[in-house]
From Swiss-Prot:
GO terms for cellular component: cytoplasm. Homooctamer. Dimer of tetramers. It holds the Pfam family FMN_dh. It catalyses: isopentenyl diphosphate = dimethylallyl diphosphate. It comes from the Bacteria. This is Isopentenyl-diphosphate delta-isomerase. It is an enzyme of class 5 (isomerase). HAMAP family: Idi_2 (MF_00354). It is found in: Cytoplasm. Belongs to the IPP isomerase type 2 family.
């Protein structure tokens, strides 16, 4: 029985990657397209003046983007994690691994995650567990990678579509609070592509969580992945569940939104999406599906070159936004249009204030 469970988990990991890569073959429209930064025609800064450094979970990092959680737990995904770690090392960005549940249940799979630390010994690495994982096991996940932080992924929609998924969730909040109290490293609670409302973030803040990853709809769709894995595909009506990255970011502009550090991810396509997310308060921006798609299509070296180009493009966008650093970018005026404006209005967001921040 244990062997069958292990094989099922390994197969699921491989299917997640294959289906996720397929989803990212074409860039979909994004809610971030409804955001327009108000720039300048007479910049105060030169490109060389721009400071892209940021702070996430108390750690200073040189760039405001990172490789988000995606994979690990099978022989195939070990090679992917090794390649992602090389990219993270060469570009000097943090990275997260996918859920480590497989390795916690089967120690022979630990190396599919530990390869990340082997390839990137001095990098910033985030471990990853579900709130289903007991705290003592979550601490093992941290030790497994000598991790700098721990992501706890919350994914009720994915679990419900997954035939073998969890069906009990009421204990999650207490488990997260226990992690906050006992973890030797910072905790990041993240969605997996269904977004967080300010109410969800407030609930997490009340149990001591200091950083969340909003992880909105628009990138890798795990409801679709799990539905595609089902023979009956019985949950096709749930494929549009959740709120987008743009909606999550706009929701955090509400006057009653909790004071908390937040990261943005979900459907990030280019440097402009990163800048818009930072302007709406994110401290850094995560990418998973697009990075793995680029890795599969173009290889490690070309993906590194692409992200190195993004660094220069980000500096240019900061110049156009008349912002020397992320703190100034967060004060840049921006217009919210279209369906995203409709969302903001009915959620009580002061969009006029956002359009006249400086």
């Amino acid at each position: 029985m244990q062997k069958n469970d292990d094989l099922l988990r390994e197969r699921r990991k491989d299917e997640h990657v294959a289906l996720g890569v397929k989803q990212n073959e074409q860039l979909a429209p994004s809610s971030l397209d409804d955001i327009q930064l108000i720039g300048t025609s007479i910049p105060r800064y030169n490109v060389k003046d721009i400071d892209l450094t940021t702070t996430i979970f108390g750690v200073n990092v040189s760039l405001p983007f990172y490789i988000n959680a995606m994979t690990g737990g099978s022989r195939h995904t070990k090679k992917i994690n090794a390649d992602l770690a090389e990219i993270a090392r060469e570009v000097a960005i943090p990275m997260a691994v996918g859920s480590q549940s497989a390795a916690l249940k089967n120690s022979s799979l630990m190396d599919t995650y530990q390869i990340v630390r082997e390839v990137n010994p001095s990098g910033i690495i985030m471990a990853n567990v579900s709130p289903e994982v007991a705290v003592q096991d979550g601490l093992r996940a941290i030790e497994m990678l000598e991790a700098n932080a721990l992501q706890i992924h919350i994914n009720p929609a994915q679990e419900l579509v997954m035939q073998e998924g969890d069906r009990s969730f009421s204990h999650w909040l207490a488990r997260i609070e226990e992690y906050v109290k006992r973890s030797p490293v910072p905790i990041i609670v993240k969605e997996v592509g269904f977004g967080m409302t300010r109410e969800t973030v407030k609930t997490l803040r009340e149990v001591g969580v200091e950083t969340v990853d909003l992880a909105g709809k628009g990138g890798t769709n795990f409801a679709q992945i799990e539905n595609d894995r089902r023979r009956d595909q019985a949950y096709d009506f749930l494929l549009d569940w959740g709120i987008s990255t743009g909606q999550s970011l706009i929701d955090m502009q509400h006057i009653d939104a909790p004071k908390i550090a937040y990261l943005a991810s979900g459907g990030i396509r280019n440097p402009l999406d990163i800048v818009k997310s930072l302007a709406l308060g994110a401290d850094s921006v995560g990418m998973a599906g697009q990075i793995i798609y680029s890795l599969k299509k173009d290889g490690v070296s070309n993906t590194i070159e692409k992200l190195e180009l993004w660094k220069e493009q980000l500096r240019g966008l900061f110049v156009l936004a008349d912002a020397k650093n992320i703190a100034e970018l967060k004060e840049t005026s921006l217009i919210v249009n279209g369906k995203l404006a409709e969302w903001g209005n009915v959620r009580g967001i002061d969009l006029v204030q956002l359009a006249n921040r400086k």
